[in-house]
């Protein structure tokens, strides 16, 4: 008995000592953070900083260490990892199934690996997805041009433009044409108007993420500057705050500033007309698009050739995060998106109608915040900044790493403050999780592509039947009504697979939820194929066969690098779209394709050796 009491006492003592040591370390950490903050406040000349000039070069004069780190993104050599990196190869070449999943949508033509926050506006202005003439000439005749809403997360000038051009009207800002809004970015800090520098990424029109997006110029405290994020957080149960955007602790803010953009979103129609800035080019009958219709904007970053601003009316829309079903304090679940998008279906039915199946498809965008919320790191109070912007030493200073990159680039700083295992062990654990999720991802995508091809086949067969025709031709509405259950399964299956595909951690932020979504996607795709067989039989089509496409089948959809197929805007057919950027839209490294081939089906003998 006495021995048991002694043992229990020893255990309690050890736990108390461990607790005291942890508490002491936590207190010291907070003291060091506070001392660091006070040192910054004492040495920084905040009078030089203002929201009227968000140029990171200007802010960097006050915070040179942080600017130096941020600009490494511009200069670093392109590299790849199994599921990331900063080499902007074509993801359509690596994953040809995406051309089928997104058939009828601009992403099916141009989609490259991301290359860092510095490049977000450069790449947004260059992508073929923002080139009306190119898209109209290459199979997407209905594309009318991107709205300025796309600038919310691509341009550090967004708050300035909302205030000074849209006069504080967020709806008007979002509803203005992208290229029209770009023309209004001012020349600051000695930059000559309409010069190459004015067009460039260092404070000019191609400037991406900047300091002011996340920091208050008065004291560098964290804040939210994007109205869509603030509105969405309020819909979840947060309270507005005039300084921070919403009331939240500093630790919460270290995630919420990232949640301004690393989220799912859509452009919600207001149902009303709104007055916005347009362009007088619409009145010049000599200016035509490639298809011969009248130009209503000039796809160029400067005002030129007499083109000027004019007030016009257009359909109103607001950048919206679909979060009202996801309440504060809850982990996100994919069914919350089902519920949300079902409720707004009368206002917003889909991002696009699938070209092959006719399904109403929601195109998911970078939902890192949603997936992370239910993961083990979020449950333990770990913020985005803790992993992606860890503390590092710059001489005697302790600063957050501002190149904003994968934790695997600096495991010692990002991971080992909590995890005591070796760097090799931790890296292997991450890769093992990502390989597992990637297997589920490929399985789901191949299953959905199989469903798509089978649906297209049955649509064609039904279209030959008189009861599915009008005026002797296949009636798409009648066929879609017959296939409505299948089309709904396609919509929801693709939403799940697209969610994990668009979320940039290959499931690492929450592997359980990622795999749950993907298994649902596989199940829905197979259920859809079963229903196709039933519908075929009910309409007298015997022995309708469904498909089961694999890696080799999928490679047949490889689109290759992006080229002009016709003469457009002084570009000749056969010219490479990214002719001036050799590292963009090229083939992925061969070893990545070999790795993908072993994932579905999962070849453990090859993968485990890595």
Give the ranges of each region predicted by the language model:
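N-terminal Sec-pathway targeting helices
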Residues: 1-15
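N-terminal catalytic scaffold of extracellular/periplasmic and nuclease hydrolases
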Residues: 4, 137-139, 199
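Primarily the internal scaffold of c-type cytochrome electron-transfer domains
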Residues: 7-10, 22-121, 163-208, 213, ...
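Non-catalytic protein-protein interaction scaffold segments in large eukaryotic complex-forming proteins
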Residues: 18-20
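Short linear recognition/processing motifs and adjacent strand/loop elements at protein termini
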Residues: 96, 116-142
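Non-catalytic propeptide/linker segments at domain boundaries
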Residues: 107, 114, 118, 126, ...
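A cross-kingdom signal targeting lumenal/periplasmic-facing segments of multi-pass membrane
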Residues: 135, 140-162, 166, 174-175
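Extended, compositionally biased alpha-helical segments that mediate assembly or anchoring
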Residues: 588-610
């Amino acid at each position: 008995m006495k021995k048991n009491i002694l043992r229990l006492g020893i255990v309690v003592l050890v736990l108390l000592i461990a607790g005291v040591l942890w508490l002491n370390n936590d207190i010291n950490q907070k003291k060091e953070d506070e001392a660091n903050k006070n040192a910054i406040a004492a040495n920084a000349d905040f009078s030089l900083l203002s929201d009227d000039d968000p140029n990171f070069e200007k802010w960097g004069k006050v915070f040179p260490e942080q600017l130096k780190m941020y600009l490494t993104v511009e200069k670093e050599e392109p590299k790849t990892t199994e599921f990331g990196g900063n080499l902007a190869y074509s993801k359509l070449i690596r994953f040809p199934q995406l051309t089928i999943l997104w058939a009828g949508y601009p992403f099916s033509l141009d989609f490259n690996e991301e290359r860092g926050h510095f490049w977000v506006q450069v790449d947004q202005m260059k992508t073929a997805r923002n080139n009306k003439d190119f898209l109209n000439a290459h199979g997407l005749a209905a594309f009318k041009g991107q709205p300025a809403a796309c600038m919310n997360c691509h341009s550090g000038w967004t708050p300035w433009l909302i205030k000074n051009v849209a006069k504080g009207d967020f709806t008007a800002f979002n509803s203005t044409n992208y290229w029209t809004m770009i023309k209004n970015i001012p020349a600051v800090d000695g930059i000559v108007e309409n010069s190459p520098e004015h067009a460039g990424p260092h404070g000019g029109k191609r400037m991406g993420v900047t300091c002011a997006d996340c920091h208050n110029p008065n004291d560098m405290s964290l804040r939210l500057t994007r109205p869509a994020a603030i509105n969405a957080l309020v819909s979840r149960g947060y309270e507005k705050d005039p300084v921070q955007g919403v009331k939240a602790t500093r630790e919460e803010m270290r995630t919420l500033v990232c949640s301004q953009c690393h989220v799912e979103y859509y452009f919600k129609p207001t149902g009303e007309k709104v007055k916005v800035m347009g362009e007088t080019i619409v009145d010049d009958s000599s200016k035509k698009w490639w298809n011969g219709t009248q130009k209503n904007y000039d796809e160029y970053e400067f005002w030129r050739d007499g083109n000027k601003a004019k007030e016009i009316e257009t359909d109103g829309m607001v950048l919206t995060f679909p979060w009202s079903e996801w309440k504060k304090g809850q982990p996100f679940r994919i069914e919350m998106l089902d519920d949300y998008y079902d409720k707004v279906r009368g206002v917003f039915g889909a991002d696009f109608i699938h070209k092959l199946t006719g399904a109403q498809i929601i195109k998911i965008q970078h939902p890192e915040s949603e997936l992370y919320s239910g993961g083990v790191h979020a449950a333990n109070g770990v913020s985005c900044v803790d992993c992606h912007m860890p503390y590092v030493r710059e001489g005697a200073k302790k600063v957050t790493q501002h190149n904003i990159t994968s934790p695997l680039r600096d495991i010692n700083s990002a991971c080992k403050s909590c995890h005591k295992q070796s760097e090799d062990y931790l890296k292997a654990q991450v890769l093992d999780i990502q390989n597992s999720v990637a297997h589920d991802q490929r399985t789901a995508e191949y299953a959905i592509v199989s469903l798509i091809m089978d649906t297209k086949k049955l649509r064609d067969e039904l279209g030959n039947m008189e009861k599915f025709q009008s005026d002797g031709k296949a009636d798409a509405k009648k066929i879609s009504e017959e296939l409505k259950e299948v089309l709904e399964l396609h919509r929801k299956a693709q939403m799940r697979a697209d969610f994990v595909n668009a979320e940039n951690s290959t499931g690492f932020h929450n592997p359980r939820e990622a795999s749950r979504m993907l298994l649902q996607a596989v199940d829905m795709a197979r259920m859809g194929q079963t229903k196709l067989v039933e519908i075929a039989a009910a309409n007298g089509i015997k022995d309708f066969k469904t498909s089961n496409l694999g890696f080799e089948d999928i490679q047949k959809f490889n689109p290759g690098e992006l080229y002009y197929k016709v003469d457009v805007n002084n570009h000749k057919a056969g010219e490479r779209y990214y002719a001036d950027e050799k590292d963009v839209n090229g083939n992925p490294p061969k070893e990545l394709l070999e790795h993908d081939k072993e994932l579905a089906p999962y070849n453990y003998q090859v993968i485990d050796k890595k």
